[in-house]
């Protein structure tokens, strides 16, 4: 049938019948973000010393230099302890995440994270330092003055835990160190791993993974002794605020499709706190960062009347303070959103970041040259990490020293390294102070830090659940913990020979199913993107995010949901899952999009299943169970975990006990 011209023409590499490429390695690292850059750096360090024969391979669906959440750069490192102690770090994270966190994992990270930051600086990352007179030196000035964190010089802090950097090339610097450690022959880029594979002979044992090349028609099958999966969080699982021509602009990276959670869950890894989400309040439409404005420039967020709504709505915190929450200097992020949403519902929006007052107050004590420098820093805050926000300010003639700029809660994101804590249940360190319930013992009786409940499978960064506030530095440090443990595992399991249930041909057919769907059905319509025989990846995602937005507590319902709404969403998702078998790809880019959608569907459905199970509103401002408003510590001061049985194809959701390790008061 002749085709009519289509606005949605294929953009990727032409797709055709693939060849099969097989690999056999000892340590396989899936993902190229901060976590696996740390894992690679540390694994090579220990393997060179104790297992030089070990075959190590890092596989990334993108290019390592600009892969992951830090791809665009950052203007601050949000986790650097310095003079603070790990106990207080745990208290801060626990307070922000409403009292339910894995304190063993957070403490363990806190005692290691600074070393990663020192490495970043040594590798060339410009860090702001205080001079002898207490004045701020930017990265270039600090380097010229011979200042460094490793030497004991004080960083410029934008908050108790945050330090300022000139970080547009942050990820490039960290990736270069990982590349230097691995060598080019142990890195494969542009390969999208989409499915993990269990061992045929040993129950609950990882054996490998399968994916495909984004630049050539190849299906890649990997056998591995140990594996770490760190492919970020989940974005575009809810309808974004940026739609139409703005579609694709998001706060977290749009290439994070829930792959970490889906792939690990599908092989039986126990998941935890998947009901948790992060809804950041950011500059409207551009999603620009607000941290430097709040913390460094001391700006306030106000309603349309110029009122500090966190002050006028202070009474909203009382019910939480009475239960022991929202105490001290840290108001949980979700509760700050809770107060902002009230302003918006009651007609006191828009909400503004009062940039004008903040800058004018600072200008009062500055020379003209200092004023221009501060103004430049305000713009560089965006240029370092969110160029689109700088573009938006320029396009709307916004001068921050003359008028404020709107801020607004975004659509929900699923992640485990920012102010969110959904993810995979991972083992804590094998130390006496760690509760036994927090340790995952392998068949040999040993505990391997950060290993999932699937033997030989690790995760880190966004993957590890119940332990947020890692950010970039913590993700790298956690990856280093994993890299060392993987080498230890290899030394203990050298004789393991992985074997799959699936044949290579079966895997090829599964991976390229969207291509075969397109070839089979393309003659049924004159328009290649509207066809009775298949569904395009873009149209599938539009259906998915409409469903989650309306029934799963998205922006369209002001983050409200209920059992009835969730059940309706699950009913629609049953049909979506049926339709997912008909996803079609006209090129390799669309094949990528198809597999991202498989992962999105699985991840966001699990998120909604956890919300349905937890009958309370643990994170007001992130989501509300309208039929169970408020906290219920008597029933729900616990983790909600889930486990999928690959043999029975069933997911069970259950409670897991929470243990407080660090005392409440210092």
UniProtKB/Swiss-Prot annotation:
Pfam families according to UniProt: FAD_binding_2
Catalytic activity: sulfite + A + AMP + 2 H(+) = adenosine 5'-phosphosulfate + AH2
Binding site for FAD: 32-35, 60-61, 67-69, 78, 193, 259, 417, 461-462, 472
Record bears the keyword Cytoplasm: yes
Molecular function GO labels: adenylyl-sulfate reductase activity; electron transfer activity; FAD binding; protein heterodimerization activity; succinate dehydrogenase activity
PANTHER family assigned: SUCCINATE DEHYDROGENASE 2 FLAVOPROTEIN SUBUNIT, SUCCINATE DEHYDROGENASE [UBIQUINONE] FLAVOPROTEIN SUBUNIT, MITOCHONDRIAL
Subunit note: Heterodimer composed of AprA and AprB. The heterodimers can dimerize to form heterotetramers.
Cofactor(s) this protein requires: FAD
NCBIfam families noted in UniProt: aprA (TIGR02061)
Cellular compartment(s): Cytoplasm
Domain notes: Consists of three sections from the N- to the C-terminus: FAD-binding domain, capping domain and helical domain. The FAD-binding domain and the capping domain slightly overlap and form a channel that may transport the substrate.
Enzyme Commission number(s) of this protein: 1.8.99.2
UniProt-annotated site: Important for interaction with AprB and for the recognition of substrate at the substrate channel entrance, residues: 160
Protein name (record): Adenylylsulfate reductase subunit alpha
pH-activity dependence text: Optimum pH is 7.4 for the adenylylsulfate reductase.
Keywords per UniProt: Cytoplasm, FAD, Flavoprotein, Nucleotide-binding, Oxidoreductase
Catalytic EC class: oxidoreductase
UniProt-listed GO biological process terms: dissimilatory sulfate reduction; protein heterotetramerization
Record bears the keyword Flavoprotein: yes
Main subcellular location: cytoplasm
InterPro entries tied to this protein: AprA, FAD-dep_OxRdtase_2_FAD-bd, FAD/NAD-bd_sf, Fum_R/Succ_DH_flav-like_C_sf, SdhA/FrdA/AprA, Succ_DH/fumarate_Rdtase_cat_sf
UniProt family annotation: Belongs to the FAD-dependent oxidoreductase 2 family.
GO cellular component, one term: plasma membrane
Described function: Catalytic subunit of the adenylylsulfate reductase which catalyzes reversibly the reduction of adenosine 5'-phosphosulfate (APS) to sulfite and AMP during dissimilatory sulfate reduction.
Record-annotated site: Important for interaction with AprB and for the binding of substrate at the substrate channel entrance: 282, 300
């Amino acid at each position: 049938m002749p085709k009519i011209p289509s606005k949605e023409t294929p953009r990727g590499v032409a797709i055709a019948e693939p060849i099969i490429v097989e690999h056999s390695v000892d340590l396989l690292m899936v993902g190229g973000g901060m976590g696996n850059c740390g894992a690679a750096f540390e694994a090579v360090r220990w393997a060179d010393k104790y297992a030089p024969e070990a075959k190590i391979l890092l596989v990334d669906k993108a290019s390592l230099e600009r892969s992951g959440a830090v791809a665009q750069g950052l203007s601050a490192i949000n986790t650097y302890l310095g003079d603070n102690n790990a106990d207080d770090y745990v208290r801060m994270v626990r307070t922000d995440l409403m009292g339910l966190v894995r304190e063993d994992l957070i403490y363990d990270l806190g005692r290691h994270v600074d070393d990663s930051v020192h490495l970043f600086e040594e590798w060339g990352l410009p860090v702001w330092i205080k001079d002898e007179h207490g004045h701020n030196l930017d990265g270039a000035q600090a380097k010229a003055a011979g200042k460094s964190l490793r030497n004991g010089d004080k960083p410029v802090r934008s908050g108790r835990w945050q330090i300022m950097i000139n970080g547009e090339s942050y990820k490039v610097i960290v990736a270069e160190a990982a590349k230097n450690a691995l060598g080019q022959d142990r890195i494969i880029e542009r390969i999208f791993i989409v499915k993990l594979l269990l061992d045929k002979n040993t129950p609950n044992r990882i054996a490998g993974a399968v994916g495909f090349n984004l630049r050539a028609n190849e299906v890649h099958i990997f056998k591995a002794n140990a594996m770490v999966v760190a492919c970020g969080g989940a974005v575009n699982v809810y309808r974004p605020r940026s739609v139409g021509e703005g579609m694709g602009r998001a706060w977290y990276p749009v290439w994070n499709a829930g792959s970490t959670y889906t792939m690990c869950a599908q092989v039986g890894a126990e998941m935890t706190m998947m009901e948790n989400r992060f809804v950041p309040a950011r500059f409207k439409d551009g999603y620009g960062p607000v941290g430097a404005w709040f913390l460094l420039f001391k700006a306030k967020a106000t309603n349309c009347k110029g009122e500090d709504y966190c002050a006028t709505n202070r009474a909203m915190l009382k019910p939480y303070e009475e239960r022991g929450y929202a105490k001290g200097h840290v108001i949980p992020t979700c509760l700050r959103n809770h107060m902002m949403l009230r302003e918006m519902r009651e007609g006191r929006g828009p909400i503004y970041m009062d940039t004008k007052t903040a800058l004018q107050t600072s200008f009062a004590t500055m020379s003209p040259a200092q004023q221009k420098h501060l103004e430049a820093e305000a713009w560089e805050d965006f240029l370092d990490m969110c160029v689109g926000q700088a573009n938006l300010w320029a396009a709307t003639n916004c001068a921050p020293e003359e008028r404020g700029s709107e801020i607004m809660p975004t659509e929900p994101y699923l992640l485990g390294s920012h102010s969110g804590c959904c993810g995979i249940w991972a083992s804590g360190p094998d130390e006496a102070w760690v509760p036994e319930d927090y340790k995952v013992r392998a068949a040999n009786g040993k505990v391997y830090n950060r290993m999932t409940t699937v033997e030989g499978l690790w995760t880190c960064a966004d993957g590890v659940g119940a332990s947020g506030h890692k950010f970039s530095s913590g993700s790298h440090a956690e990856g280093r913990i994993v890299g060392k443990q993987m080498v230890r595992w290899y030394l203990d399991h050298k004789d393991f020979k992985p074997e799959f249930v699936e044949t290579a041909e079966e895997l090829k057919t599964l991976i390229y199913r969207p291509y075969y769907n397109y070839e089979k059905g393309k003659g049924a319509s004159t328009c290649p993107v509207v066809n009775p025989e298949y569904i395009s990846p873009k149209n599938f995602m539009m259906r998915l995010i409409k469903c989650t937005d309306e029934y799963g507590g998205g922006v369209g319902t002001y983050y409200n949901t209920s059992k009835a709404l969730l059940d309706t969403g699950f009913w629609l998702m049953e049909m979506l899952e049926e339709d997912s078998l008909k996803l079609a790809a006209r090129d390799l880019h669309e094949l990528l999009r198809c597999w991202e959608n498989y992962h999105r569907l699985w991840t966001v459905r699990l998120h909604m299943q956890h919300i349905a199970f937890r009958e309370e509103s643990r994170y007001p401002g992130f989501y509300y169970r309208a039929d169970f408003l408020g906290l219920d510590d008597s029933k729900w001061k616990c983790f909600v975990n889930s486990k999928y049985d690959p043999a029975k194809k069933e997911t069970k959701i259950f409670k897991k006990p929470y243990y407080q390790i660090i005392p409440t008061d210092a």
